[in-house]
Amino acid sequence: MTMDTAQLKSQIQQYLVESGNYELISNELKARLLQEGWVDKVKDLTKSEMNINESTNFTQILSTVEPKALEIVSDSTRETVLKQIREFLEGIVDTQ
């Protein structure tokens, strides 16, 4: 019997939260983003977008700012967090 993707995702998320790993990974990501000035850069991007388009529609602003925000995450932060996630998954998912 195979598990569908949604069920697997749900179980992984549940285990992440229950094990405390979600909080650890989340805290590490927040600290790194704050330290490298990412939060301030995203705030500036958002303000700029609001001024340019005179739009206060959250969905429109998000659709413009989100790709740029993801793009400016440093490689070292991205690699560190992805490594933590991979290590967590290797510990709970049978990959053989």
UniProtKB/Swiss-Prot annotation:
Signal peptide: none annotated. Pfam families: EnY2. One of its GO terms (biological process) is mRNA export from nucleus. It is found in: Nucleus, Nucleoplasm; Cytoplasm, P-body. One of its GO terms (molecular function) is transcription coactivator activity. InterPro entries: TF_ENY2, TF_EnY2_sf. There is a cross-link at K68 (Glycyl lysine isopeptide (Lys-Gly) (interchain with G-Cter in ubiquitin)). Keywords: Activator, Chromatin regulator, Cytoplasm, Isopeptide bond, mRNA transport, Nucleus, Protein transport, Transcription, Transcription regulation, Translocation, Transport, Ubl conjugation. One of its GO terms (cellular component) is nuclear pore. Component of the nuclear pore complex (NPC)-associated TREX-2 complex (transcription and export complex 2), composed of at least SUS1, SAC3, THP1, SEM1, and CDC31. TREX-2 contains 2 SUS1 chains. The TREX-2 complex interacts with the nucleoporin NUP1. Component of the 1.8 MDa SAGA transcription coactivator-HAT complex. SAGA is built of 5 distinct domains with specialized functions. Within the SAGA complex, SUS1, SGF11, SGF73 and UBP8 form an additional subcomplex of SAGA called the DUB module (deubiquitination module). Interacts directly with THP1, SAC3, SGF11, and with the RNA polymerase II. Belongs to the ENY2 family. Involved in mRNA export coupled transcription activation by association with both the TREX-2 and the SAGA complexes. At the promoters, SAGA is required for recruitment of the basal transcription machinery. It influences RNA polymerase II transcriptional activity through different activities such as TBP interaction and promoter selectivity, interaction with transcription activators, and chromatin modification through histone acetylation and deubiquitination. This is Transcription and mRNA export factor SUS1. It comes from Saccharomyces cerevisiae (strain YJM789). The lineage of its organism: Eukaryota, Fungi, Dikarya, Ascomycota, Saccharomycotina. The gene is SUS1.
